[in-house]
């Protein structure tokens, strides 16, 4: 275990694994623990290696016995006995490095040792476990890939159907293209008008904001003037109490004060008028906004009514088409009814005439049928005679085939005997040649001895 990179299993585990996973049928039944311990049997080990190669590489056992040489070779039996062992050895040398076994030799096939065979078989078992796990994982990946492909195909189909539906919904039929163009132009005009009105409303709102700022400034100025007037009145009352002036100066001061009061009143009146104008403008702006909102609502109602009228027009057109088709069908049905009535009267006349003709034809046919039955009886008798002849021919052919089969079997037996005789002759000739060679060698040796003796 310290040298190997794989676990060495027990003999019972190895036997059970190879019986269930590698071998099949009678081979799995006959493969036991005695084939590996105490001394492994070379035939069973070689057969097991062949089955492993068949499982992994689809290399059947009969393929090992094919001799890759020309037909005209001397003693092909020697090659036939040696070819499968060398083929298994070459294939195992190529395969076992994958299982982390690098020192496989011919002695492991011809004269296997227990410890060595157990390590090799446990290495192969470890690789087969790994292979099984990888196959399960790849099968799971393939199933998931197939499911994903099915989903993708379903999604592509749904996408194509959705695209077709979108095309149907977006494309306007030629009958409604003129109406659609008119509606589009009307909508464009409405949108331009609404934009202009929105611009006017925004301009009015800006003016209203300016007026509001002006009103605020004027109100501030008014408050300041009122404060100034109050301060001036206080100062005047103080000055009156402190200073006693001349009547002329008082008159002048009073006139000045009156002029200033008049000016203040005039400015106040102007400010009030301006305020009233601005309030009127604000009211007008609010009225304009309300009117614009009403217009927008009317436009929306108009669009909804246009769509409803369009739907109703389509329904009316479809109903008109249905009405026309029904009227046409009614006309065709009425004409067909008249034609059928005429045809019925004609048919009744024809049937009465045909009934008489049929009766006459029936009498003629009955006579013909009687004649045909007589001919059929004669033909049936002839047919039975022919069937008997065919059965006799079939019996003769069957007997002939049986004779042919017996002759073929006899020929095969004779050819087998001839082949056996030929093989015996070959073996005897080989033995005879060997004996002659031995005799020649012995005679040569005797001659040499005689020469040396003389």
Swiss-Prot record:
One of its GO terms (biological process) is mitotic spindle organization. Keywords: Cell cycle, Cell division, Centromere, Chromosome, Coiled coil, Kinetochore, Mitosis, Nucleus. It is found in: Nucleus; Chromosome, Centromere, Kinetochore. The keyword Chloroplast does not apply. GO terms for cellular component: Ndc80 complex; nucleus. Residues 143-347, 375-439 form a coiled coil. The keyword 4Fe-4S does not apply. Pfam families: Nuf2. GO terms for molecular function: microtubule binding; protein-containing complex binding. Its main location: nucleus. Component of the NDC80 complex, which is composed of ndc80, cdca1, spbc24 and spbc25. Acts as a component of the essential kinetochore-associated NDC80 complex, which is required for chromosome segregation and spindle checkpoint activity. Belongs to the NUF2 family. This is Kinetochore protein Nuf2. It comes from Danio rerio.
